């Protein structure tokens, strides 16, 4: 079968930079699925993405589907004909669906009977006939939250479309995609190279676009060039560029022909906290800040132009003029804000609503202040400092700097607190109260910061659940999932002695009578335990291990973590599978028992050697393991419990649990309940697969 290279390029207006990669990757994934579903053999599928185009290149694409043999079994002969031998309605309907008459059908004989059979040789469709609809379907499935219409057309897409190139080898595949007739025309850079040219074969892409159009269509190559050139530019001025992955991706999505340039700003602006300067450079201007080897911000920045200029200094000067007013604003706000102490902003918090039913930011501040102090007392942090940090926690939201540069909340609170002479752990806590902000983010660094971060998040969880606004589907406007996971991470990774039960109860108590959900405490805890499930799955733990621990509903996160590690280790033991099966058997037996059990196992009623031996082991282990359970030494406890495999096996092989004599039967059921209770001190081992 003949194979050719296939190319599709959709030429558009500037695509959303933050979505460019996901659009291209989805386009490739969707089209690959279409090819596979159609049975079209193909080689590597490459995607290309630049600000004004999405493209796919498929190597070794078959020119048609393979021919195939089709078999359709019809009704059994007994149902296909009536007593007179005439075809039944079922047989005629089946034959009509196959495009034949009943007389034309073959017969299939098996040892189970005889059926009507249709066989046909189906010729595969050509790739040229299939591809247009496959491309259209792949584009329609792109993750585009908001579509556009343009001109008088009813066509919708993420941005207006100007060209559609569809080539199989050197042939144009005729089609109308997104309202545009396919052709071999490609548009180059807006200001460099050829604005428009034709491509002869699919194999010429993307090299022809690079050479004639001055566009680097390969997203990864463009990104790598920006990174390498920016690193070299930073080295030349004795610094290191802040090349965060997210900004690199965004800049790579903004330019077709990246040219890296270095500019500077006045050193006087370095008196402003670096975070504010970096915020405007990265967030507003898409510049890369530069730091010296000690991590101090330099009065330089690196930016990426989309054109090779004959006078690059003019571009540099233009960017310096653009950024200067923004830095001057930051300087002005910083100097103005420092004329007031942080706590002077407290009254203004009363004017800002946190949530309609839950009050203002001042109300939230009062609750955080009290809760942070309570948490500090539980974990051995400085209660006065935690209380002070809680009081000041939201004051920076009222400052000019944070109002203008919203992402500097927290960090500006830290700088202003230091200026006011607050304790260092209080100042740091104001910055770290929002940590962890995302998966893998740093945790608060000191106990006061931990207390404040937990208090802030728990107040939000208690309040929003308390008015019944649980997250639904992918909607989570108050970021409750992130808050819950943040609390759990802090408690587990910092090994804090906090119990979700008492922590949630305290957070709820501080709301007074504002909350309407009577089950708020249980709802919050269940939600947080659900976050544990997601967290440990991400960490590589099996679902049944997580369920075994969740079945015990441990509300102390550090304790939950210890149980998870213990059960995970238990699974590596030779005895694990047998004991898990035995626990499952015990669980089923006890679930069916209808008679009340004894409080203790009566030794005088034990008859069989196997049950006497099992009872002896349980007595020894019960006494031995109590300190293990009390200290959370679950791994050691399960290792000890593994020794029960032999006596448990002997018991089930030689003892009839449901004996006819009632006293013996109840005593044996009680013995099994005591066995199960020991394992349940750690987890429900019966749930392990």
Swiss-Prot record:
Gene Ontology CC terms: cytosol
Organism: Salmonella arizonae (strain ATCC BAA-731 / CDC346-86 / RSK2980)
Protein EC: 6.1.1.14
Record-linked Pfam families: DALR_1, tRNA_synt_2f
Any one GO biological process: glycyl-tRNA aminoacylation
Subunit structure: Tetramer of two alpha and two beta subunits.
SUPFAM superfamilies on file: HD-domain/PDEase-like
Reactions listed under catalytic activity: tRNA(Gly) + glycine + ATP = glycyl-tRNA(Gly) + AMP + diphosphate
GO MF entries: arginine-tRNA ligase activity; ATP binding; glycine-tRNA ligase activity
UniProt-annotated location(s): Cytoplasm
Gene this chain is encoded by: glyS
Major localisation: cytoplasm
Protein name: Glycine--tRNA ligase beta subunit
The organism's place on the tree of life at top rank: Bacteria
